[in-house]
């Protein structure tokens, strides 16, 4: 009897690792995952790790969508669980998405792989992710700031972000942050205006009387991030591209500095208008 059961499991495991293009195979229940982590490096390398709890039943782990390479699955002892197909196997859905089926195990399982999902555009790297459970996105130390669904986040001493309860996200970050520092000097006061963009910037100007900052962007569809002191130019703000009002995102970097983020669809003159500005000094 035991020999027959072993034969059924062994044959089933052999079938499981064969790609199936027209059927979806789910064995047992969804796995209980202790950790779901995606790590993004400055060079665009995407590394994913799942830590799966032990179970006395077969369980299935859905992998992230995309082109997967360097897939390994080991137990807590570091033993290869793919060996002989007796402990784990791969299943494919009709769209080619991969899942890992883990057979009953008294140890936690660790799944690791790389995703070929980064889309490079000059110096800006983009990845779109989606998962049905809470997962973390960790960034290498060289990455200073990211865009999460078009919202800018300065990492500073934070390692990354967590998407609670899962969901989809568009992540963007620079492989080499392109900073332009413009100094505004007014009498004895000096203010730095920092512009982060892959676009060439010309004709930067600060006008105290009109409470505005202006500059020329020379490329279309490029993210432009402006960081400046609220003391220099306070909000609320209006931003124009060649006299046409455009959308922008605003956040605070810290207590004193605001961040404005835009993406002009065409090249032209950007004008940022505030409602408050440093007072004029008497001559």
Task: Specify the residue positions occupied by each region the protein language model found.
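Bacterial N-terminal signal peptides
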Residues: 9-17
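Lumenal/extracellular ectodomains and adaptor appendage modules
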Residues: 21-280
């Amino acid at each position: 009897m035991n020999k027959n059961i072993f034969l059924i499991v062994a044959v089933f495991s052999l079938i499981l690792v064969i790609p199936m293009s027209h059927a979806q195979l789910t064995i047992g229940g969804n796995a209980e995952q202790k950790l779901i982590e995606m790590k993004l490096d400055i060079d665009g390398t995407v590394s994913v790790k799942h830590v799966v709890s032990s179970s006395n039943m077969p369980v299935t782990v859905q992998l992230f969508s995309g082109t997967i390479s360097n897939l390994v699955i080991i137990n807590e002892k570091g033993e290869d669980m793919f060996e002989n197909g007796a402990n784990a196997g791969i299943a494919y859905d009709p769209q080619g998405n991969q899942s890992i089926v883990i057979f009953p195990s008294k140890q936690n399982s660790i799944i690791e792989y790389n995703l070929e999902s980064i889309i490079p555009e000059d110096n800006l790297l983009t990845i779109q992710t989606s998962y049905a459970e809470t997962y973390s996105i960790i960034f290498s130390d060289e990455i200073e700031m990211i865009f999460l669904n078009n919202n800018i986040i300065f990492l500073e001493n934070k390692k990354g972000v967590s998407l609670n309860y899962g969901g989809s996200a568009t992540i963007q970050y620079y492989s080499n942050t392109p900073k332009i520092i413009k100094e505004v000097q007014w009498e004895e006061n000096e203010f730095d205006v920092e512009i982060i963009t892959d676009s060439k910037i010309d004709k930067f100007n600060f006008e105290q009387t009109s409470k505005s900052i202006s500059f020329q962007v020379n490329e279309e569809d490029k993210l432009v991030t402006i960081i400046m002191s609220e003391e220099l130019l306070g909000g609320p703000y209006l931003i124009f591209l060649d006299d046409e009002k455009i959308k922008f995102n605003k956040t605070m970097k810290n207590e004193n500095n605001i961040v404005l983020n835009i993406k002009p669809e065409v090249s032209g003159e950007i004008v940022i208008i505030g409602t408050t500005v440093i007072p004029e000094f008497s001559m």
